[in-house]
């Protein structure tokens, strides 16, 4: 048995560099598993998408090929392919993929919100008349002031005469065309 020299304790390095940047963040095994399961669910959502929707999501070639293969495979092979897709997602930044997927999911909600906004603008145009036209022109400079003013006048006459709101619908359609031309 060898004996340790008496000065072996003096060689223990001091922690002179106590930088916060070098701090190791401890992650539990359960948290790693939860993250892996979440990425597998993300992969399953990607596999369930159609080709047109998949084209709108920023994927590299390897991941796209794996997803397309998983769409063709059935039964047990599909499960293994889903595991592979989850593993591929763990090696990549998944945030752009999540954002694109959320955008696809929320497209309907965004469209409904846009329609509500356009309806409110239409109602404001009918109520305030020519005073609200500059606001529309600020939003869409290409808007035709004369056409908008005539539609507003007709909508006011229809409202006063308790007639069907044909011009009101035309104002909404015109505003929707302006909003779509902007996108």
UniProtKB/Swiss-Prot annotation:
Q: Name one GO cellular component term.
A: cytosol
What segment(s) does the record annotate as region Disordered? 1-23
Q: Name one Pfam family in it.
A: DarP
SUPFAM superfamilies the record matches: PSPTO4464-like
Q: Name one GO biological process term.
A: assembly of large subunit precursor of preribosome
Please verify whether the record's keywords include RNA-binding.
yes
Q: Which residues form the signal peptide?
A: none
Entry similarity comment: Belongs to the DarP family.
Q: What is the protein name given in its UniProt record?
A: Dual-action ribosomal maturation protein DarP
Which species does the entry assign this protein to?
A: Cronobacter sakazakii (strain ATCC BAA-894)
